[in-house]
Amino acid sequence: MSSQPSKALETFDNPTPGRDFHIHMEIPEFTCLCPKTGQPDFAVLYLDYIPDQKCVELKSLKLYIWSFRDEGCFHEAVTNQILDDLVVATDPKFMRLTAKFYVRGGIFTNVVAEHRKPGWQPQPRVELAEFESQSNIRG
């Protein structure tokens, strides 16, 4: 697999297609260029989805996200483009992409875009106690 930016998203078979489960990813190094000024824009992307038959492969996702580094994109457009491309690649039951852009001109921009497969209904939510820290880092 390449180590250069790429628009190709790879997938693998969902190991448990009979169960709805939630995949959460945090992508802290998204960059693109402001189409007006050419200045870099930075964001943290949060990808949440419930897969159907396919899951997105992580290295291809990293290279795909990297491919926007030198592209001029409005925040709203790039968030929706990424969601659309991920939906085409994986055909999930549900997918939400949240893009939290760093401050620009004194304004923080958050864009949330969602996809829901027609006819899919989520299971009722089960409320569980939260752990003190949801971090993957132990210390």
Swiss-Prot record:
Pathway: tRNA modification; tRNA-queuosine biosynthesis
Protein's organism: Methylobacillus flagellatus (strain ATCC 51484 / DSM 6875 / VKM B-1610 / KT)
One Gene Ontology term of the molecular function aspect: preQ1 synthase activity
Reactions catalysed: 7-aminomethyl-7-carbaguanine + 2 NADP(+) = 7-cyano-7-deazaguanine + 2 NADPH + 3 H(+)
Keywords recorded for this protein, A-Z: Cytoplasm, NADP, Oxidoreductase, Queuosine biosynthesis
Entry binding sites for substrate: V56, E57, L58, H75, E76
Recorded superkingdom: Bacteria
Keyword Oxidoreductase (UniProt): yes
Gene Ontology process terms (BP): queuosine biosynthetic process; tRNA modification
Principal location class: cytoplasm
Enzyme Commission number: 1.7.1.13
Annotated compartments: Cytoplasm
Record's protein name: NADPH-dependent 7-cyano-7-deazaguanine reductase
Function, in words: Catalyzes the NADPH-dependent reduction of 7-cyano-7-deazaguanine (preQ0) to 7-aminomethyl-7-deazaguanine (preQ1).
Gene: queF
One protein family per Pfam: QueF
PANTHER family documented for this protein: NADPH-DEPENDENT 7-CYANO-7-DEAZAGUANINE REDUCTASE (PTHR34354:SF1)
Family that this chain belongs to: Belongs to the GTP cyclohydrolase I family. QueF type 1 subfamily.
Enzyme class, spelled out: oxidoreductase
InterPro entries membership: GTP-CH-I_C/QueF, NADPH_dep_7-cyano-7-deazaG_red, QueF, QueF_type1
Residues forming the catalytic site: C34, D41
An annotated GO cellular component: cytoplasm
